[in-house]
């Protein structure tokens, strides 16, 4: 991991910090600086976002690691993650748009992992409230209205212990050509019965409470009908995860996450097109199929009606493949937007091979501005030999269709715990005066 000059300049004039915050700044601050540098952010925007990261994100990451085992295993980053409370995303640019950088965190506080806060809500809500007071574009009206509908009504002590865990995450998007920081909140119902009631009870009532009794629920109702009556849509399963934009109510989107265990490309295409109701050109479907097969390590000649080959773990057990999607619900739209997620953490393809496949796709189709800058980021976070031989940096690639091209985002992990010993060697070799 090589330092970026602007990170050094910002660090030089920061006030003293405690040991935990110093650690997280040295690791994740450098990651953020490298991403913005490679993405071509203006220097003033880099400084602004680094200061936001230092003072509004770093204090929420909790104690620094003391070993390669997390004291609290965060759900950020999904199955690929090592328990670290932060991960990143890189939304590849288009011909007229630079890449966009985001991070996702599960805020950790004094009550995290204690009986006083079994769902780890306190630190997250405090952070969101702070954002609403310091970021002019952040509006929590929708979040505060939705959140009580997702909170479980748990009385029995055994149930509380059984269902304890993360219930909220926060995402921050830092666009290169904007002076705002866009905030998203993600809610996770902990009680299984809540998930089954999401489309029929919880979301309709939450949307009426937020937008008024006469809110148009066409988009939400379509998702419910698609998942109950359509032959392909009925194979989808709700995860319960719901994302919400923390902005003015009229601009807020609600994202509903689902999974399927049908891995045939015909099924994937049917979900992306909402059973043909949202057409996608044959050319784009062909691009998506080629990318899907390559990232999943499937032979190019595999018929589109066939399931992906079952993957086997090193211990000989089977590794089930699931495909996540989300539906983007907005009251003013009759149909939801759809995004697919390609999990590469369980793929037989190495992280480096997967990243190269995406960059190659973008270059072949004239998408993105300097997509190889993304490779520079990955190689800076993790040595090339580890990207070639180990898994864990890459979590997902998401794919949506925007303006007649594939809009691709990479989600990846800093591996703070997995690479704990390497980080210790690196940090102990740095000049302490730069950071303290």
Curated annotation (Swiss-Prot):
Entry superkingdom: Eukaryota
GO annotation, biological process: alkaloid metabolic process
Enzyme nomenclature, EC number: 2.5.1.-
Molecular function terms from GO: prenyltransferase activity
Listed Pfam families: Trp_DMAT
Pathway the protein takes part in: Secondary metabolite biosynthesis
UniProt entry keywords in alphabetical sequence: Transferase
NCBIfam families registered for this protein in UniProt: arom_pren_DMATS (TIGR03429)
Protein family per UniProt: Belongs to the tryptophan dimethylallyltransferase family.
Function: Prenyltransferase; part of the gene cluster that mediates the biosynthesis of neosartoricin B, a prenylated anthracenone that probably exhibits T-cell antiproliferative activity, suggestive of a physiological role as an immunosuppressive agent. The non-reducing polyketide synthase nscA probably synthesizes and cyclizes the decaketide backbone. The hydrolase nscB then mediates the product release through hydrolysis followed by spontaneous decarboxylation. The prenyltransferase nscD catalyzes the addition of the dimethylallyl group to the aromatic C5.
Protein name per UniProt: Prenyltransferase nscD
Organism: Trichophyton tonsurans (strain CBS 112818)
Gene that encodes it: nscD
């Amino acid at each position: 991991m090589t330092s970026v000059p602007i990170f050094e300049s910002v660090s030089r004039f920061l006030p003293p910090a405690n040991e935990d915050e110093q650690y997280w700044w040295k690791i994740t601050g450098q990651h953020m600086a490298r991403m913005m540098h490679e993405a071509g952010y203006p220097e003033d925007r880099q400084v602004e976002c680094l200061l936001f990261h230092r003072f509004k994100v770093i204090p929420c990451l909790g104690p620094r690691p003391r070993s390669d085992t997390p004291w609290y295993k965060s759900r950020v980053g999904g199955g690929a993650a090592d328990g670290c409370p932060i991960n990143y995303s890189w939304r590849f640019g288009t011909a007229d748009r630079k890449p966009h950088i985001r991070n996702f965190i599960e805020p950790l506080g004094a009550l995290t992992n204690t009986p006083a806060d079994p769902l780890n809500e306190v630190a997250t809500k405090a952070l969101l409230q702070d954002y609403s007071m310091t970021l002019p574009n952040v509006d929590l009206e929708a979040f505060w209205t939705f959140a009580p509908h997702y909170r479980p009504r748990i009385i029995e002590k055994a149930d509380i212990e059984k269902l304890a865990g993360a219930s909220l995450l926060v995402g921050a998007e830092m666009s290169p050509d904007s002076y705002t920081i866009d905030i998203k909140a993600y809610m996770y119902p902990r009680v299984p019965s809540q998930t089954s009631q999401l489309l029929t009870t919880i979301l309709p009532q939450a949307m009426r409470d937020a937008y008024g009794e006469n809110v148009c629920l066409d988009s939400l109702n379509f998702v419910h009908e698609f998942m109950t009556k359509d032959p392909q849509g009925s194979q989808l399963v709700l995860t319960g995860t719901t994302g919400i934009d923390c902005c003015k109510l009229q601009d807020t989107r609600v994202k509903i996450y689902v999974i399927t265990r049908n891995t045939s490309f015909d099924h994937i295409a049917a979900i992306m097109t909402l059973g043909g109701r949202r057409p996608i050109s044959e050319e784009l479907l062909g691009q998506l199929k080629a990318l899907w097969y390559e990232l999943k390590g499937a032979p190019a000649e595999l018929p589109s009606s066939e399931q992906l080959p079952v993957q086997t773990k090193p211990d000989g057990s089977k590794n089930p493949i699931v495909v996540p999607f989300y539906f983007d619900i907005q009251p003013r739209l009759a149909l939801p937007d759809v995004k697919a997620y390609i999990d590469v953490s369980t793929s037989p393809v190495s992280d480096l091979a997967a990243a190269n496949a995406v960059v190659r796709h973008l270059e072949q189709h004239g998408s993105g501005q300097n997509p190889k800058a993304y490779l520079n980021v990955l190689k800076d976070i993790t040595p090339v030999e580890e990207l070639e031989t180990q898994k864990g940096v890459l979590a997902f690639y998401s794919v949506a269709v925007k303006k007649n091209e594939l809009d691709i985002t990479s989600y990846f992990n800093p591996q703070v715990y997995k690479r704990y010993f390497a980080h210790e060697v690196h940090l102990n070799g740095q000049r302490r005066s730069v950071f303290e």
